[in-house]
């Protein structure tokens, strides 16, 4: 299953009948079990329904950084992103 950014945005936690998805490096994870983190009011709610790769790499919650773009990231930031990717892979099922 592949999701467009528009389709992914429908899984942002605002509809309790739908799961919550976050994408990292183009891979979409079902983070519904982490609803307290990614659901409305959670500390990472801004990532729900989006590809948060750049923001995770930069350890940023800034809307401008919530993007799949890895352009211009430092080696250190890529390493941070890889660590996040490993955490997501270990904790959440891949859906797309």
Per-region residue spans from a language model:
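Histidine-anchored, small-residue-rich loop motif
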Residues: 1-96
């Amino acid at each position: 299953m592949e999701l467009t950014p528009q389709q992914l945005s429908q899984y942002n936690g605002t509809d309790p009948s739908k799961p919550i998805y976050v994408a990292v490096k183009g891979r979409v994870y079902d983070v519904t079990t982490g609803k307290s983190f990614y659901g409305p009011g959670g500390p990472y709610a801004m990532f729900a329904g989006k590809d948060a790769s750049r923001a995770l790499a930069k350890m940023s919650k800034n809307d401008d950084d919530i993007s799949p773009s890895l352009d211009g990231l430092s080696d250190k930031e890529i390493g941070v992103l890889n660590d996040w990717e490993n955490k997501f892979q270990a904790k959440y099922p891949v859906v797309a």
